[in-house]
Design a protein with these regions (language model features):
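Glycine-rich ATP-binding loops of the HATPase_c
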Residues: 158-164
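Short conserved segment of the HATPase_c
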Residues: 119-131
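Short alpha-helical segment of the dimerization/phosphotransfer core of two-component systems
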Residues: 6-11
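Short alpha-helical Gxxx[C/S/T] motif in the catalytic ATP-binding
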Residues: 4, 146, 150
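Detector for a conserved hydrophobic position within an alpha-helical segment of the HATPase_c
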Residues: 154-155
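Short helix-loop "hinge" at the ATP-lid/N-box region of the Bergerat-fold HATPase_c
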Residues: 84-88
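Short beta-strand/loop element within the Bergerat-fold HATPase_c
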Residues: 93-105
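A conserved beta-strand-to-alpha-helix junction within the catalytic ATP-binding
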Residues: 30-45, 97
Length: 189
């Protein structure tokens, strides 16, 4: 009975994630200036139960404001931070760094970096594809849709995504977003 219940929960998560992925391709974007630092702190508070009892060193730098849809960007940050928590689980001392790269006038480059299990850069281009997993499902839960959703949301904002990692040394996921609202629009589809 437990196996059936677990399978039903996993199927429910998969369906929810697929619906979210589909919505992110169609949903109107409500553009405004978004304070990423504030969003990060909100997301970390929401994920506190996942971090409870763990030894995690958080290193959060000042983050810029960008033009974007606050709800969608919250989903991006929630996915990236949840992944950092998940993939540092085997570490007795996890380190999660959230910051931005300097020097870009037209775009803000924000990253989430961890000292988790990492990945082989040979597969970096697959990381953002739907249903792509670089680790076995038995090791780390997930549906393989989260980073595909991140890429879709960032692309809809006129941005880009990429990743860096090394096996057993951690990973960094980068998102580049326009600093200003694009074209002064309030809604964008």
């Amino acid at each position: 009975m437990d196996t059936i219940s677990d399978s039903a929960k996993k199927m429910g998560m998969l369906i929810d994630d697929l619906l979210s992925f589909s919505r992110m391709g169609r949903q109107a974007i409500s553009l405004r200036q978004v304070d990423l630092g504030s969003l990060v702190h909100d997301v970390i508070r929401e994920l506190e139960p996942d971090a409870a009892g763990r030894n995690i060193a958080w290193c959060i730098s000042d983050l810029p404001a960008v033009g974007g849809d606050a709800a969608m960007l919250r989903m991006v940050l929630a996915n990236l931070i949840a992944n950092a928590l998940k993939f540092t689980l085997p570490r007795p001392q996890a380190r999660i760094e959230i910051g931005s790269l300097p020097g870009q006038a037209s775009e803000a480059v924000v990253f989430v970096r961890d000292n988790g299990v990492g990945f082989d850069m040979t597969y970096a281009d697959k990381l953002f594809d739907v249903f792509q997993r670089l680790h076995r499902a038995e090791e780390f839960e997930g549906t393989g849709i989260g980073l595909a959703n991140v890429r879709r949301i960032i692309a809809r904002h006129g941005g880009r995504t990429w990743a860096e990692g090394k096996p057993d040394l951690g990973a960094a996921i980068y998102v580049a977003l326009p600093r200003a609202l694009q074209g002064g629009e309030d809604e964008k589809t």
